[in-house]
Amino acid sequence: MAPQTETKAGTGFKAGVKDYRLTYYTPDYQVKDTDILAAFRMTPQPGVPVEEAGAAVAAESSTGTWTTVWTDGLTSLDRYKGRCYDIEPVPGEDNQYIAYIAYPLDLFEEGSVTNLFTSIVGNVFGFKALRALRLEDLRIPPAYTKTFQGPPHGIQVERDKLNKYGRGLLGCTIKPKLGLSAKNYGRAVYECLRGGLDFTKDDENVTSQPFMRWRDRFLFCAEAIYKSQAETGEVKGHYLNSTAGTCESMMDRAQFAKDLGVPIVMHDYLTGGLTANTSLAIYCRNNGLLLHIHRAMHAVIDRQRNHGIHFRVLAKALRLSGGDHLHSGTVVGKLEGEREITLGFVDLMRDDYIEKDRSRGIYFTQDWASLPGTMPVASGGIHVWHMPALVDIFGDDACLQFGGGTLGHPWGNACGAAANRVALEACTQARNEGRDLAREGGDVIRAACKWSPELAAACEVWKEIKFEFDTVDKL
């Protein structure tokens, strides 16, 4: 094998001593049903051939290294290597390409999202031949999917446990997120739940701080849940954040929540770790707890268009690892989300079979082989005027979380919750009657205001509040 030692002028980049194309670029390869497929957006360094860059990604994320080693002869590299089988330019972008790579199933440990990510994205992102690299999508074959439990319960079982059908679920993140005592925190939870919400939520960074230790919070929130259930006759819940500094502490918190008889706990799956999340999901399945997942830290990984990991991949990873809810963006609120792309990964979270559709960012057809679905959670800067769009975009199988849009009501938390509940039911009824919420949503809300003073007050407060900025992909 001829070494490459040429230094590219003006870049200081040395292509290395091994030509990956000879082994790992295989455009004639026929993809197998059992292969794990990856679509990488890559930006090669100046002077690096695109085929070499694609082959390098395949090599460094599977069996390759920078030189030939004698132990290559002790195994069958042709059986275990990743293969770059196709490369296409990204329309409208200079020097950006989508590299399609197939990985044999035997490269991965069964039931381990941690091992899957360690192999595919663990090392290759620092490769010198690439200026930038982004994992856009993965195809998980049924043969691998079947090695995972997935979400503890899934959407249908959650509805059965809650006895709530025919509409989206309503939630609220308690604010201020930090600083309240446990008793005052529980009071805020109670007011929201008795006003008409289905759930309230710990914020992602509420764990066990000096002003509110986790055990005290769990106790006061459980009291709020039971009191509001007795008043309303509905099943209520609060996402008790079980994320902790150690896996042992995390499991202790989940165990305490189970002992209290509450229906749901919460985990920050990226900061807490995928291994910890899978363990918690298995515990929740075995003990009848729903599991709400927050995606804290996701934007560090997924926000840049040319480097990192797209959220659709993180969403697929979570569905494998296990979670009944996952924050997914809103399209209409303060947090970023483009409509068609967001709907693409929302479908990947909750549907069983999703066809390839590049207009929605779906690079591969995904068959989840009856793995339970994960309910998307829309939150971040939304209020009652957004309700028609949210019902139109997400449909019924979603949890709509109004934090400031509940607690910011001028008459208090319970009235804010009532306003959101009235708006949701009015929009759901209008949709069921065949009305076009995208065009008539404002009229639906205004009509509902006539018989809900709480909604009328909310509409007056938030009538001018908008979050209109371009997404990062357009900047």
Swiss-Prot record:
Residues with the modification N6-carboxylysine, per the entry, are 201
**Maturation propeptide residues:** 1-2
Q: Which reaction does it catalyse?
A: 2 (2R)-3-phosphoglycerate + 2 H(+) = D-ribulose 1,5-bisphosphate + CO2 + H2O; D-ribulose 1,5-bisphosphate + O2 = 2-phosphoglycolate + (2R)-3-phosphoglycerate + 2 H(+)
One biological process term in Gene Ontology: photorespiration
According to the UniProt entry, which residues carry N-acetylproline? 3
The protein's required cofactors: Mg(2+)
Entry's Gene Ontology molecular function annotations: magnesium ion binding; monooxygenase activity; ribulose-bisphosphate carboxylase activity
Q: Which InterPro entries match?
A: RuBisCO, RuBisCo_large_chain_AS, RuBisCO_lsu_C, RuBisCO_lsu_C_sf, RuBisCO_lsu_fd_N, RuBisCO_lsu_N_sf, RuBisCO_lsuI
Location of the active site: 175, 294
Q: What is its main location?
A: plastid
| Site keyed Transition state stabilizer: positions | 334
Q: Where in the cell is it found?
A: Plastid, Chloroplast
> Which residues are recorded as modified (N6,N6,N6-trimethyllysine)?
14
Name the residues that bind substrate. 123, 173, 177, 295, 327, 379
Q: What is its EC number?
A: 4.1.1.39
One GO cellular-component annotation of the UniProt record comes to: chloroplast
**PTMs?**
The disulfide bond which can form in the large chain dimeric partners within the hexadecamer appears to be associated with oxidative stress and protein turnover.
Q: Which HAMAP family match?
A: RuBisCO_L_type1
* Other remarks in the entry: The basic functional RuBisCO is composed of a large chain homodimer in a 'head-to-tail' conformation. In form I RuBisCO this homodimer is arranged in a barrel-like tetramer with the small subunits forming a tetrameric 'cap' on each end of the 'barrel'.
Task: Tell me the function of this protein.
Answer: RuBisCO catalyzes two reactions: the carboxylation of D-ribulose 1,5-bisphosphate, the primary event in carbon dioxide fixation, as well as the oxidative fragmentation of the pentose substrate in the photorespiration process. Both reactions occur simultaneously and in competition at the same active site.
PANTHER family associated with the record: RIBULOSE BISPHOSPHATE CARBOXYLASE, RIBULOSE BISPHOSPHATE CARBOXYLASE LARGE CHAIN
Assembly and oligomerization: Heterohexadecamer of 8 large chains and 8 small chains; disulfide-linked. The disulfide link is formed within the large subunit homodimers.
The Swiss-Prot or TrEMBL record describes its family as follows: Belongs to the RuBisCO large chain family. Type I subfamily.
Q: What is this protein called?
A: Ribulose bisphosphate carboxylase large chain
